[in-house]
C-alpha cells in the first residue's frame, strides 16, 4: 500500500500533474503499473481519509486550539508502529515548527492507517510530506519538510 501512495504522490500530486477524478481510471492505471487491486483500494481509502481530516465537523484536527507545546504520550500501538527514531523525528519537526500539535496528530493518524508490517523513518518523512501537502496554509512547512527529505548530507561521511 505504501508503494502505491509513493507512486501517486511522486507521479501526480508532487509533480502537480492534474489528478484524475475518475477512481476507476486511476485504478486501471495503477493495475497497469503493476499494483494489486486490493492494495490500490487501501491506498485510495488512505488518501480519502487524509482529505477527510480537513473536515473539522468530522475530525476537529484543523480547529484552532492552544498553541503551547504539549508532550505527546504515545499509546502502546503507536509505540509499536513508531520506533524511537520516528518519535524523535516528530518531536524535532515540532521544535523547528514544521509540525504543530495538530499536524502531528494528523501524521500519527495516517501512519497508524498504513497497512504495512515495516515502517521506518524514511516512510515517516514521506507521510509528513503528504499530510503537509494536504493542509491549507502549510506551504512553508511543506517546503521546509521537502528540503529535509531531499537534502544531501554535507561533508565527508566517516
Curated annotation (Swiss-Prot):
Coiled coil: none annotated. InterPro entries: Smg. It comes from the Bacteria. Pfam families: DUF494. HAMAP family: Smg. NCBIfam families: PRK03430.1 (NF002897). PANTHER family: PROTEIN SMG (PTHR38692:SF1). Belongs to the Smg family. This is Protein Smg homolog. The gene is smg.
Amino acid at each position: 500500500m505504501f508503494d502505491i501512495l509513493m507512486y501517486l504522490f511522486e507521479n501526480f500530486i508532487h509533480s502537480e500533474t492534474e489528478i484524475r477524478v475518475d477512481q476507476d481510471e486511476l485504478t486501471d492505471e495503477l493495475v497497469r503499473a503493476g499494483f494489486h487491486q486490493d492494495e490500490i483500494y487501501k491506498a485510495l481509502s488512505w488518501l480519502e481519509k487524509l482529505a477527510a481530516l480537513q473536515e473539522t465537523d468530522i475530525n476537529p484536527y484543523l480547529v484552532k486550539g492552544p498553541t503551547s507545546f504539549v508532550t505527546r504520550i504515545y499509546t502502546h500501538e503507536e509505540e509499536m508502529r513508531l520506533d524511537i527514531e520516528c518519535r524523535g523525528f516528530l518531536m524535532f519537526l515540532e521544535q523547528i515548527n514544521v509540525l504543530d500539535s495538530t499536524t502531528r496528530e494528523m501524521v500519527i493518524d495516517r501512519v497508524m492507517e498504513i497497512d504495512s508490517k515495516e515502517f521506518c523513518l524514511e516512510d515517516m518523512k514521506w507521510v509528513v510530506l503528504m499530510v503537509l501537502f494536504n493542509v491549507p496554509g502549510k506551504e512553508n512547512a511543506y517546503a521546509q519538510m521537502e528540503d529535509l527529505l531531499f537534502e544531501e548530507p554535507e561533508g565527508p561521511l566517516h
